[in-house]
Regions:
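Class I S-adenosyl-L-methionine-dependent methyltransferase catalytic core
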Residues: 1-179
Length: 179
């Protein structure tokens, strides 16, 4: 899907704010195609869920960000920068990164999809994101489609590679964008 947007991605700061950079196919794709796409910078943030063990340790409780630029794009292990907070896309720290971004590319949590789109619209960000088909029927999402502020991408998400290397089949997921 992303190859269809090569011209729009050129010289842009791309933000993947809902994908663990150590496991994300988006991170891998942008790192491998950094020069081909001509992107300026890639920012990825990781959400760190709180649990009994991470809550007691402030370092383990925080999420992290990964930034890839022309200078470090070939590094085998780019530097992970700890966030002050947990890396939730709604946190003030991640919203500041969102403001820096030109285009957001991610697979947001479907349970928070309305809230996620609302944030992108509020900050006037361009995006290419994975979405459940059911979201197209949400009243607030349908208004965006009707007013030509959001439309379907070129393709469908039929399957994706999970962090353990297995392939998960999908049948009800597609791309939405405002590019």
């Amino acid at each position: 899907e992303l190859n269809f947007y090569k011209d729009q991605l050129k010289d842009k700061v791309i933000y993947c704010n809902c994908d663990d950079p150590s496991e994300s196919a988006f991170t891998d794709f942008f790192k491998l195609n950094f020069d081909y796409l001509g992107i300026k910078k890639l920012i990825c943030t990781r959400y760190q869920k709180s649990n009994l063990f991470t809550y007691a340790d402030p370092v383990r409780r925080s999420g992290y960000r990964l930034e890839i630029t022309a200078k470090n794009k070939n590094d085998k292990k780019p530097v992970k920068i700890n966030l002050k907070e947990d890396g939730d896309f709604r946190s003030p720290e991640c919203i500041e990164l969102l403001k820096e971004a030109d285009i957001v590319v991610t697979n947001p949590p479907f349970s928070l999809f309305r809230e996620y789109i609302e944030l992108l619209v509020k900050y006037n960000r361009q995006f290419i994101i994975v979405a459940p088909d059911s979201a197209l029927h949400y009243k607030d999402i349908f208004k965006l489609i009707k007013s030509n502020k959001l439309w379907l991408g070129y393709g469908r998400v039929k399957e994706f590679i999970q962090s353990d290397g297995t392939i998960k089949k999908m049948g009800n997921v597609g791309w939405v964008t405002n590019l």
